[in-house]
């Protein structure tokens, strides 16, 4: 695998906003975008809404290059004052117009009739929607004569390129992760070892206790970490096992913290591995190899590189150290997940860094999170977030790697 750098390009680097426009120009359908969801569950809706948060489903769409939305009286004033949309339309008025456009109805017009009425008024023949668009609404809009195209890939592919402001928001998410790790380290330092047990404040230390402490600390700093992984021993060998029950001394504990910043909606995503007690040589070698693989992966990241090449560097590092991946009817051991994924308004978004070819773009933000998992020995994963640059990766996360706590 080549590790040589691409030759320097003499042209002036484009700002992130310009790169976003170039990516957007390659959207799979020329039709304007349409969304009907809320900003709490939809990263696309939050992106399109330029950060203003509305927690009930609402109509948002493009018309003549403008971002438009329909809001009830409850939200109209707040959304209007935010200036996040180019045009804010009152829902009540458009319900009345839909009544007239579809006379004889026994029930008030729903989203489909309102959207169809809007489309006629705005002289729009149809819309482009995401694969997550409500199926019933999709069918109804087509029945009403609108062309509805499902986007091939992301609805807003330009989301992949992060501006400096977005990168700072993701860095804040990772700062919250670091807050959580500091809490974990403090608890593990204060915990006492009694045989194989870990005792904290006169109680057995459990995964749930760690998870609760992490959530509380992050909430106090302005974030939410609803799902936290704090899994020890063989539980940690299932990468998405959250962890439950007592944690044991001298066993590896994977802590994966992916908080959302409540103010902005952007996510962080970091993982560290810990052990309270004394590690065996096999455990130390496992952790050292994962750390080496992560360094190799990060060193390979730069604009224009195939993400599969980053993944291969991780695989090569593990193979050179003698760690095998095996699959069976009972599950897998070794390294059996991707090296990374995009992070932004969703904790998992484009691009994916795995065996599939994909050219990394300047400004993309990805995780690099290799791991090794062997029941009986334990699991280790180390994860950081980087922004893809023309000459390499820029870390957007920071926390020490001190993992063995006596």
Where are these regions (language model features)?
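Active-site neighborhoods and metal-handling regions in enzymes and metal-associated proteins
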Residues: 2-406
